[in-house]
Amino acid sequence: MAVDMELDGGGDGKGKAPPQISLSGLFLACMVAGGVQYGWALQLSLLTPYVQTLGIPHALTSVMWLCGPIAGLIVQPCVGLYSDKCTSSLGRRRPFILTGCIIICISVIVIGFSSDIGYALGDTTEDCKVYRGPRYHAAAAFILGFWLLDFSNNTVQGPARALMADLSGRHGPSAANAIFCSWMALGNILGYSSGSTNDWHKWFPFLMTRACCEACANLKAAFLVAVVFLGLSTAVTMVFAREVALDPVAAAKRNEGEASGLLAVFKGMKNLPVGMPSVLIVTGLTWLSWFPFILFDTDWMGREIYHGRPDGSPAEVTAFQEGVRQGAFGLLLNSIVLGISSFLIEPMCRRLGARAVWVMSSAVVCVAMAAVSVLSAWSLGDFGGSVQDAARAPAEEGGVRASALALFVFLGLPFAVLCSVPFAVTAQLAASRGGGQGLCTGVLNISIVVPQMAIALGAGPWDELFGEGNIPAFAMASVFAAAAAAAGVVLLPKVSVRSVSMAGGH
């Protein structure tokens, strides 16, 4: 059943209210989201295709992504809980943001130099221009960096969102989430621009080695730029996010007798705000519909649309890499629409209600995922529907490729809803009971990562049953999107117009 609610503002309830911050100050305080998202964009657009060049088969690439859900399941709720109680002089959120960003920098350097690490450990003595075999040491280094990156991303993301809710004040959580979403869009634009650029190796030729040819050097350079941008954005956030530290004595008294660690997280889940369980259910279904595309979008462009293979002939590899770059360009267009749309979400919620906006976005995703499946079948239709057959045939399908890019653009608005509305509703629900922004954000993340675990475990084997393509996963995503829309109509709380714009503190 839907729950009608009138939610008013309220701080976190765990100490002095933060000083009032201007909208421009709030914008600068959120800059770390852009830095983190830059690296995340590179991870999404390039790493699934790249790891296949190291010898990991397509069916196992989704399993590699298990690290994100596992990290989200363990790290974000715990970090959210401890950040609610942190008594550091830097404040509650900034210590976790700073630590996570340092680890992100280390992890992306490991990923960028994974081929060189594997070469040093004895993968091969041949030059990368002639060697086409597996490089398992490089793959191991890559996966280590990949997992470390996901754990550190989760360390930053929960406190960063909670920080925005803490500081939002009179601007409200919807405005804070719109700013967060706009920084994500900017990070995506920069990251996907880097991923779609094929000239990094020309600008930084010293990054090419016997183990690292052009594609590898492009990846390496893009991640080194990510380190610089993340360092800058973290510094700006640390300066402008002026938190008020918790009083250690008062915090100790308040925390006496409370459970700690994961026990506290599960204890907190028993006392969620009214309406939060429904939000968790709909969020889970929504992410089941999105994660196949997030995981395989550039791989889909390389395989189904450009008919390439990461482990095929030189011509097939070239076609695959071109498809991946075009997929990154599609994600760039998607991010531009995301950035524009992020400023439309609050007016839409004010006019239609958060529930209606969320439900309509799920309906759009349902149509889009069905269109992806149809477009893929159309692209492969002349080759018997087989990715392997299509990879050996010439591909001159300008209409199909243009339609594929159009789908990336079409998904920009619902992705803006995904990045904003669930978190804004969660912040309002937390404010309605006087605090716990960090814990509620962490618990919401559980409803995101559990579907991701299901997709990560099942998508690769499921697709392999149908010829190693991505069509079955996208078709199933359309079904989940329809279920999310139906569940949203029945279950989501009806948040008042006033609460959308004003909830979140005074």
Swiss-Prot record:
Topological relation to the membrane, as annotated: Multi-pass membrane protein
Chief localization: membrane
GO function terms (MF aspect): sucrose:proton symporter activity
Keywords: Cell membrane, Membrane, Sugar transport, Symport, Transmembrane, Transmembrane helix, Transport
Pfam families reported for this sequence: MFS_2 (PF13347)
Domain of life: Eukaryota
Pathway: Glycan biosynthesis; sucrose metabolism
One annotated Gene Ontology cellular component of this protein: plasma membrane
Record localization: Cell membrane
InterPro entries in alphabetical order: MFS_trans_sf (IPR036259)
Expression (tissue specificity): Widely expressed. Highest expression in sink leaves and lowest in germinating seeds.
All ranges on the Cytoplasmic side of the membrane: 1-20, 76-94, 157-171, 242-275, 349-355, 426-441, 492-506
Residue numbers on the Extracellular membrane side: 42-54, 116-135, 193-220, 297-327, 377-404, 463-470
Oligomer status and interactors: Homodimer.
Family as reported in the entry's similarity comment: Belongs to the glycoside-pentoside-hexuronide (GPH) cation symporter transporter (TC 2.A.2.4) family.
PANTHER family recorded: SUCROSE TRANSPORT PROTEIN SUT3, SUGAR TRANSPORTER
Role this protein plays: Responsible for the transport of sucrose into the cell, with the concomitant uptake of protons (symport system). May also transport other glucosides.
Protein name: Sucrose transport protein SUT3
Species for this entry: Oryza sativa subsp. japonica (Rice)
Gene: SUT3
